[in-house]
Amino acid sequence: MLLRKAGESVNFRFMKHIVMGTAGHVDHGKTALIKRLTGVDTDRLKEEKERGITIELGFASLSLPGGKILGVVDVPGHERFVKNMVAGAAGIDLVAMVIAADEGVMPQTREHLHICTLLGIRKGVVVLTKTDLVDGEWLDLVREDVRAFLKGTFLEASPIVPVSALTGAGFDELLSAIERTAGEVEEGADMGLFRLPVDRVFTMKGFGTVVTGTLTSGKVATGEEVEISPLGLRTRVRGIQVHNRTVETAEAGQRTAINLQGTDRAVIERGYLLAGPGALTPSQRLDCTYRHLTGAGRKLKNRTLVRLHTVTSEIMARVILLDRDELESGGDGFAQLVLEAPLAAVAGDRFVVRSYSPVTTIGGGVIIDPLPTKHKRSSAVVLREFKLLAEGGDAEKAAVILERAGIGGITENLLIVRTGIPGRELRRLLEGMFSAKRAVLVDRDEMRVLSAPVYEDFQAAIARELQRYHERYPLKGGLSREELRTTLGMGDGVGQKIFTMALRDLERKGELIAEKEMIRLAGHRVRLQGEMGSLREGLSAIYREGALAPPTVREILERFPDRQKEITSLFQVMTHEGELIRICEDRNFHRDSL
């Protein structure tokens, strides 16, 4: 994508933004097909020209007869470049499965179909290329073979269109088939969070660093601040192009080129993400559902090292099977992926897994929590959470993530990331949870939310801690607010806010009493029995008799040299309860004397 100069902006909108990608075996004519459809030769590298194969991703745009414009991604077919194919396929809505009529179904045809299935692609057209090299009888045989191959897959009912890029035969029918299929693509729910997985980075003279990708959710505008994840580096959008046209904003589903202000090309690579500042949190653990492909060749054992491909990233990971020790071919299970480097993902992201060596596609799945903690294997509680996150409704998913977030709670933005629930739907869901007292709002500005059961458990922990303190120090009127907060592990900021809110709610319910900086249970009374009770009565009498000229604290301690510890405790109790009024450090008065 080229970037036009300022002043050449075009008003350019789409009703539905769709990206079509190619798939198929090496040298089956994918690039020639795209060139015939769009006029663009997507093989731009010298090595690609010399070898006659696609190595890197290629991009173009396709104008359909009805006026809709599709983004197009041309992917490599060679087995050595499948990782590039996965990066390109991650953002597509429909696939053009290309099969050469003179060769038929080949190994990468099968592997690419597996990858498209694992990535959740549900629509496509099947293109039989190079028909000028075969006769009609052979073409009919190939067509039947392809139909048999596609049976039971998402392409089973898709149109099969024979074409020749050399003669142009069949291309009108192909355009019509693409247009019909594009109209069947269901518009996915937009989470509202701007996210662009980077699949290409280059430097353009006069403009600087440009990144491209398919905008998976949200929107972005010229001048906005964005963050490069997982680096945490922030920069601004200098310019935007969609299908070679300069625009002010780009929306979910569009192939987009973004010119980044003052950013070195060397710091960005394919697999990084552009997102809103602070919107995404990189993690080295991902909870997921996993399917081991039929025909994967061998069982998947716990802790197997694999190559993980998600959106445009490739990263090494270990598969921790949580519900078994090994997974048969064709089997499904729950797993946690432990990554070798941080990755920013969102619940609902699909992934492909390839074996470490020999490198081949063996499975894939769906991320159900991109920010989990380490789990205990075979835990009934953990497996129940996984089942709810994988199969439950939005309310069940939100409840699990709220509980996992603990007493610190979670912001609405992070809840979107960890559940995959679109922003508007999540806001309605949370309002219902507040009304039903299943969630607690901590801060409306930040939209930080707590699980109601977790919050109730925390209030119970406050009461237990106070009870323990009262039992240990029966002569003390209460525990200092700061000591209680520290004991419960509630730090400054959010922790202090939630702690203060819990104290207020407990006081409102009549369960505790907060007096200045001292906190006590509502039913707590200092109980003085035996000698301590008698000592208190004697101390009270001394102060009553002294009236406005009572002895100093030092003088009283000198009268009871063997009971100074008890006297000091009694001073604390009597001043806390208001019987003695402290005027200065060494002087108290009885309340009846004032």
Kindly label every feature range from the protein language model:
Residues 69, 75-80, 90-113, 121-140:
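Conserved Switch II/interswitch segment of TRAFAC-class P-loop GTPases
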Residues 1-14:
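Intrinsic disorder/low-complexity segments
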Residues 137, 148-296:
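Conserved catalytic-core segments of large NTP-driven translation/proteostasis enzymes
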Residues 11-75:
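Conserved G1/Walker A P-loop phosphate-binding module
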Residues 26, 53-55, 61-66, 87-91, ...:
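Conserved catalytic network of the ASCE P-loop NTPase/AAA+ motor domain
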Residues 78-79, 102-106, 130-135, 165-169, ...:
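Conserved nucleotide-binding/hydrolysis micro-motifs of P-loop NTPases
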Residues 134-138, 148, 263-582, 587-594:
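C-terminal effector modules of nucleic-acid-centric enzymes and ribosome-associated factors
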Residues 27, 33, 52, 72-74, ...:
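Residue-level signature of catalytic and energy-coupling elements of molecular machines
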